[in-house]
């Protein structure tokens, strides 16, 4: 029997509205048979005209993809992640915006009925750094989002916009 581990999402630094049970989500996730879809690692310098496009498709019952993008000082990059899955897909995206750099992450969910998508976005903004997260949730299935962005300098900023079909 495959080992299942618990994944905790949306862990708040201080419990609020605990009686509504919105402080965190606990998911069972099978690590033993998880298919590693590999990693994408990029370091960007300058202002990129072409976005980095990533088509991420789940394989098998459980699969995982890791993405790590660093925008070097005074750089700008747009990343477009399109998710597709029939079963369970975990996408872990790590972003680093160096001094006065901007990262725009656009996530488009296009998963199937009965699927489960977990999108975990972590990031760090240095002085004047900015991360923008735009999510379009138009597919089917269950979607879990977990975002944690550290603002580590003067003028560092984060903005998020999410749109979904109910």
Predicted regions and their residues:
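Conserved beta-strand/loop scaffold segments within soluble protein domains that form the structured core
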Residues: 4-5, 37-166
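Short, Gly/Pro- and small/polar-rich lid/capping loops
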Residues: 1-38
